[in-house]
Amino acid sequence: MTPEAATDRGLRLLVSLTRGGARLNRVVARSQTAFKNLAEGFLTHALSGAEMSSTTVALYGVDAGAYETQRSLSDWERDWYEAVLPPAPARVLVTAAGKGREVAALRSMGYTVDAFEPVESYVERCSKLAGDGLVLTADYLDFCRAVLDDGQGPAAPLAGRVFDAVILGWGSLTHVLTRDEQQRVLAASCALSPQGPVLASFFARGATAARPESRVGRLGAAAGRLVGRFRGVSAAPLQIGFFWNLGFTYAYSAEDLEGLAATVERQLEWQPEPYGHATFLPPS
């Protein structure tokens, strides 16, 4: 075989392998999407709200690589913070703080920062970035209990404190799935920052589609409804979706946000893009 023929055969083999790899990649992607839709349809009909929340925390703790501390603030976040936060060295509470991405950024800007986070391994990382700030292992249920109810539980040290601002950690409001829980989280945040802003980021309804109506998704939903009826569980609203790396999510509409602002008697400023974010401001 001549060198030219060998080169030509090698190139044809490379093209064939590349095409085969592309086809395999498409098959894998379609399979992943189908399985995700099947699971979403089933789980949103078979699990209670509390079970969806605990599943979300568990998945959030598994996908550690998605929440690296080294990731800096996005441009929209930095612009947002500069526009609405009181000047440093104000004291800020960061909820659901993950590994401390916001904590590190705020401290570099001169703020004093306290935080809480439900995943213990993340709390350890976050604590190293908080300086003298308080970092607790707690979730939103603990937070609301400490601030709104009996002042007890893992978040008890926060009860009675006053902050100049509260930041609900990146996208964390998206994982608060029921209207009652959403109202309580916002009420607790406002109680700790009575004169300051509360900042929240989330999936916005216009930017995040509702659950897809695929054949596989409908099959999963049908199976989930049977299990849900047996367990006495109602189906989740269409605003709730499911992602392997995020768990369950709630996509907010303008009406949702306006309703939440009204319950705490706050002024609302919000933007759906590039990532949904809102500021709940005290009355002027």
Write out the residue ranges for each language-model feature:
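Conserved S-adenosyl-L-methionine
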Residues: 266-276
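Class I SAM-dependent methyltransferase SAM/SAH-binding core
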Residues: 99-151
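SAM-dependent methyltransferase
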Residues: 200-260
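A short glycine-rich, Lys/Arg-flanked "PGG" loop and its adjoining helix->strand segment in the class I
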Residues: 183-195
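Conserved class I S-adenosyl-L-methionine
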Residues: 7-98
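A short SAM/SAH-binding and catalytic strip from SAM-dependent methyltransferases
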Residues: 164-180
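A short acidic, Gly/Pro-enriched loop at the edge of an enzyme's catalytic core
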Residues: 146-166
